Amino acid sequence: MVITGFTFFTAVVVTTVQLFFERRDETRRAQQLNTLTTLFFSEIGDNLIRMLNQCDRANQHLSQTLPAPEEWTEAHFKSLASALRSHRVDIDPLSADTEALRKLLASSLLFRLLEAPHVFEHDLFNSLLRTMFHLRGELATHPDLTVLKQHKLDHLANDITKIYNPLVKLWLEHMNYLARFYPALFHSLLENNPFKPPAGGNNGGNTAVL
């Protein structure tokens, strides 16, 4: 009985220690992924959202529902998230700044992110990066979109939509994570969020999602 009790106690201790290290590893992975996601949006993602907003015929309708406060709060973010989730993008490739888009998609950071194990394991992030590489190839193949036939423009519109929707979904997911664990960084990024109208501007423009 003593041996049995000791064995049971040892098993419980070992299991507890294993759980501790597993949770610690999960926390570390989440923190590392968060750092990479912050870097992505800082260097590429936010600007990409702004560029793709310019291609969205439905953006004017969306912008009328977005908050436009002088100082953004978490409540404004929740209103923004709600508006984005119910929005449907309507992409016009001919409205895109293709040169700026090509330059952004040529960033070496995309390759480094795709090689990062934590990004590879994140289905949404990994899929988004691969879709961005696909669009990069399409734009390289078609330097002048104005000469394309409608079926090819429709194909490009679909490619851009496949980027825009998960891109904004990842942005919302990331901002929710920051709001929970890094509120100071969350509020800092919220003040400069890619859906915020330019200073002195109105809420008109282009956007869409989920």
Where is each model-derived feature located?
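Membrane-embedded hydrophobic alpha-helical segments
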Residues: 1-23
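A broad, structural surface signal
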Residues: 2, 35, 39-42, 46, ...
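Secondary-structure capping and boundary motifs in well-ordered enzyme cores
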Residues: 4-8, 33, 124, 128
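Membrane-proximal, non-transmembrane interface segments of integral membrane proteins
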Residues: 26-108
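Soluble C-terminal extramembrane regulatory/interaction domains of multi-pass membrane proteins
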Residues: 97-207
